[in-house]
Regions:
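N-terminal interaction modules that seed assembly of large macromolecular complexes
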Residues: 1-47
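Short, recurring structural edge motifs at helix starts
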Residues: 23, 95-99
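Structural motif corresponding to the C-terminal cap of alpha-helices
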Residues: 92-96, 121
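Short Lys/Arg-rich basic patches
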Residues: 1-20, 56-92, 134-135
Length: 135
């Protein structure tokens, strides 16, 4: 499905960083939609255990190039699989509770998905503590 949106500068940097991590080539010929789909699938099994507030607070520490002023926001159309888009929509609803807000925009959800995937790839993903510890 094709979705039109404006991605923020940190999201654009995250896309570049994730591409570098996955393909070791920042000029790899893959679409932004494909990378968002890869990121979503990489964290899909952990969605309910991820500490989204911690990821949101750590955004500036996730990428090396965050302060690169040559990178600006991006108006783009993402081609996403239906399952990925459905997952993003479910996260939008979940994030309204997590961040105690009445409205949640897709670009913000996509940004957090990318940052969570980058943190997972670098073994720095913060998961919520298990509520039922069997000790």
């Amino acid at each position: 499905m094709r979705i039109q949106m404006r991605l923020s500068r940190p999201t654009v940097v995250a896309i570049q960083e994730y591409k570098q991590i996955k393909f070791a080539d920042p000029k790899a010929k893959v679409t932004n939609g494909y990378l968002v789909g890869m990121a979503y699938k990489a964290i899909q099994n952990d969605l309910d255990r991820i500490d989204w507030k911690a990821i949101n607070k750590d955004i500036s520490n996730v990428t090396i190039n965050y302060d690169d002023n040559s990178i600006s926001d991006l108006q783009t159309a993402l081609n996403l699989e239906k399952t990925v888009l459905d997952g993003i929509e479910k996260l939008q609803i979940k994030f309204m509770d997590v961040f105690d807000t009445k409205r949640m925009f897709r670009p913000f959800v996509i940004k957090l998905i990318l940052f969570a995937a980058i943190l997972k790839e670098t073994d720095n993903l913060t998961l919520l503590k298990e509520e039922n510890n069997n000790e």
